[in-house]
């Protein structure tokens, strides 16, 4: 929420810790300060991962602005950064520009910080989705996500998820974390082949 205060974020993190949530996503300006003594395991025990965004929600920021925003978030202590691609480049089939943008951002978000790339799949053809996923794999993105949920065209479709899963499978990058057969069964119930 744009009106969120530091107190709101602190309360969100406390609630996430209490509920055992793995992560909370906050605006870059609201990334909480790291504990004064990070070696104090009591201070960090059960604390959720801090995720944030860059180029959100439109993806229309200049590449260097996105990379700078992402790098600043890393320096503030973000554990994960979700970045929105410039979907116009994907629609136009400008794979080189897309790869260049993603490489610049990956350099700004060094591992072990997690880089998640958000596509707006509701706007993309099958080939554009496949090209975006291949670009994400090529630059070492850790995750590829279907949509921001903010675009008027809509969010994820099962077809888009299947296309992305197929492309990730080809690159041997499709994994199910922590759920194994249950995940496959659940996705199967939704009609997704994983």
Predicted feature descriptions by range:
Residues 22:
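Metallocofactor- and cofactor-centric catalytic cores in central/energy metabolism, strongly enriched
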Residues 26:
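Small/polar loops that bind or transfer phosphate-bearing groups
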Residues 1-19, 29-192:
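Alpha/beta enzyme core
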């Amino acid at each position: 929420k744009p009106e969120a205060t530091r107190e709101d974020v602190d309360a969100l993190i406390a609630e996430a810790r209490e509920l055992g949530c793995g992560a909370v996503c906050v605006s870059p300006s609201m990334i909480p300060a790291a504990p004064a003594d990070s070696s104090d395991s009591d201070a960090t025990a059960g604390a959720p991962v801090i995720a944030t965004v860059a180029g959100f929600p439109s993806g229309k920021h200049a590449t260097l602005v996105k990379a700078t925003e992402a790098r600043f978030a890393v320096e503030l202590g973000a554990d994960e950064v979700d970045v929105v691609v410039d979907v116009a480049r994907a629609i136009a089939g400008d794979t080189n520009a897309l790869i260049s943008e993603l490489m610049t951002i990956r350099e700004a978000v060094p591992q072990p910080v997690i880089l998640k790339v958000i596509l707006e799949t509701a706007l993309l053809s099958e080939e554009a989705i496949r090209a975006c996923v291949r670009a994400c794999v090529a630059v070492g993105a850790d995750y590829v996500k279907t949509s921001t949920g903010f675009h008027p065209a809509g969010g994820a479709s099962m077809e888009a998820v299947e296309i992305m899963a197929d492309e990730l499978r080809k690159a041997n990058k499709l994994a199910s974390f922590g759920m194994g057969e249950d995940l496959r069964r659940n996705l199967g119930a939704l009609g997704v082949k994983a």
